[in-house]
Regions:
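Loop/turn elements at helix/coil->beta-strand transitions in domains of secreted/extracellular proteins
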Residues: 21-24, 80-83, 108-111, 140-142
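A ligand-binding cleft/hinge motif common to bilobed small-molecule-binding domains
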Residues: 84-108
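Short secondary-structure boundary segments
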Residues: 29, 89-90, 161-162
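Mature extracytoplasmic/periplasmic domains
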Residues: 128-178
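Conserved beta-strand termini and adjacent loop/short-helix elements that scaffold enzyme active sites
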Residues: 28, 87, 114-116
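Periplasmic-binding protein-like
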Residues: 54-60, 64-67, 105-134
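Extracytoplasmic ligand-binding site segments that recognize negatively charged/polar headgroups
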Residues: 1-81, 92-98, 121
Length: 178
């Protein structure tokens, strides 16, 4: 409720450096792998210099010194300490599911997910993947494992239990993440 639809219209990750967000943003520490992958994505799309400037703007807009995990960022927004949290949707869904207790579920119900950069390259996503090592001694079994991970049964397990997005057609994401 503290962030308007007009503020989110056309919102991008790059926009998080805008001074209008001063004191309104929470995010994990820069050493976290999620932030490193987001920064790598921004470097790929915008270059090193622009991304360095972006990072300075984000730091200037932080509501507090980065602390805690993604759920801590969501809790901070729910508590009114900030207006925007950079967090993975599966943590929000985990909280909404009640698996982390009633306090976190209640907090999660106070926030909404938003997917930036929808007018251009799309939202940055962290990827979970499987790969085969050339010369692996059990290649046939490794292929079977990857094939199993790509079955509807496995993908539904991921979407319903870890709230990840599915990788195959015919399996829908959990309603808690969309």
């Amino acid at each position: 409720e503290r962030v308007t639809g007009a503020e989110l219209s056309g919102m991008t990750y790059e926009g998080l450096a805008d001074p209008k967000w001063k004191g309104r943003l929470v995010i994990r520490k820069s050493s976290n792998i999620y932030n490193k992958s987001l920064v790598a994505s921004l470097i790929k799309n915008n270059g090193k210099k622009a991304t360095a400037e972006w990072a300075k703007g984000v730091v200037a807009n932080m509501a507090r010194t980065p602390t805690g995990n993604d759920r801590a960022q969501i809790m901070a927004v729910a508590a009114g300490e900030a207006d925007i949290a950079v967090a993975n949707t599966y943590y929000l869904a985990l909280m909404l599911s009640g698996k982390k207790g009633p306090e976190q579920q209640a907090a999660a119900k106070k926030v909404k997910a938003f997917f930036p950069n929808q007018n251009d390259r799309g939202t940055h996503m962290n990827v979970s993947c499987a790969a085969l090592v050339k010369g692996a001694p059990n290649k046939a079994n490794a292929v079977k494992l990857v094939e199993f991970l790509l079955t509807p049964q496995s993908q539904e397990h991921f979407t319903n239990n870890t709230f990840e997005f599915p990788m195959i057609d015919g399996v829908s994401p959990s309603p808690l993440v969309v």
